[in-house]
């Protein structure tokens, strides 16, 4: 069987849809997570579902149910393009190795800075982009953690949501 992620990504080419994840779950569920720059609408999910149903049938992909949805407000970040896209947003990262006894950090993501002389991004070693994370180490003590994608175990958006709404 072909790589399911690659097959799905190819099927969505030209649809202005970003494939975030393809996951097999219990009882034959195939869960496909998509995103768009301007947000995922129900019509996008319907269109992707119809397209993938046809492709999966032709390719003999075994599943009982297909679920297509958005990654939600706490979407995972998995590659450099996603980290660059969400620079300036609040994220949470978990490091592979603890730093000062701590692995999980939340703060504002910084994109790699361009070197004034060469116009190239900061890199660590073999051309790996170095991102920054502004976080509050102690009250009113903002620090910046520098990291590459190899340094992290996982990352996700970590927005601050206001559920208070309007008062009556």
Curated annotation (Swiss-Prot):
InterPro entries: Ribosome_maturation_RimP, RimP_C, RimP_C_sf, RimP_N, RimP_N_sf
Family from the record: Belongs to the RimP family.
Subcellular location: Cytoplasm
GO biological process terms, semicolon-separated: ribosomal small subunit assembly; translation
Record's protein name: Ribosome maturation factor RimP
Gene Ontology cellular component list: cytosol
Function text: Required for maturation of 30S ribosomal subunits.
Domain of life: Bacteria
One Pfam family hit: DUF150_C
Keywords tagged on the record: Cytoplasm, Ribosome biogenesis
PANTHER family the record matches: RIBOSOME MATURATION FACTOR RIMP
Keyword match Protease: no
């Amino acid at each position: 069987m072909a790589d399911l992620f690659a097959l799905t990504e190819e099927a969505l080419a030209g649809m202005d849809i970003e494939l975030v994840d393809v996951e097999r779950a219990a009882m034959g569920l195939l869960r496909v997570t998509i995103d768009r720059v301007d947000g995922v609408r129900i019509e996008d999910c319907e269109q992707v579902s119809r397209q993938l149903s046809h492709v999966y049938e032709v390719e003999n992909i075994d599943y009982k149910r297909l679920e297509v949805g958005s990654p939600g407000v706490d979407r995972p970040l998995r590659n450099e393009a996603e980290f660059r896209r969400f620079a300036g947003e609040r994220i949470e990262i978990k490091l592979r190795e603890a730093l000062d006894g701590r692995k999980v950090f939340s703060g504002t993501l910084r994109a790699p800075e361009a070197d004034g002389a060469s116009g190239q991004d900061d890199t660590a070693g073999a051309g790996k982009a170095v991102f920054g994370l502004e976080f509050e180490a102690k009250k009113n003590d903002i620090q910046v953690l520098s990291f590459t994608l190899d340094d992290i175990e996982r990352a996700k958006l970590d927005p601050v949501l206001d559920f208070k709404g309007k008062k009556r």
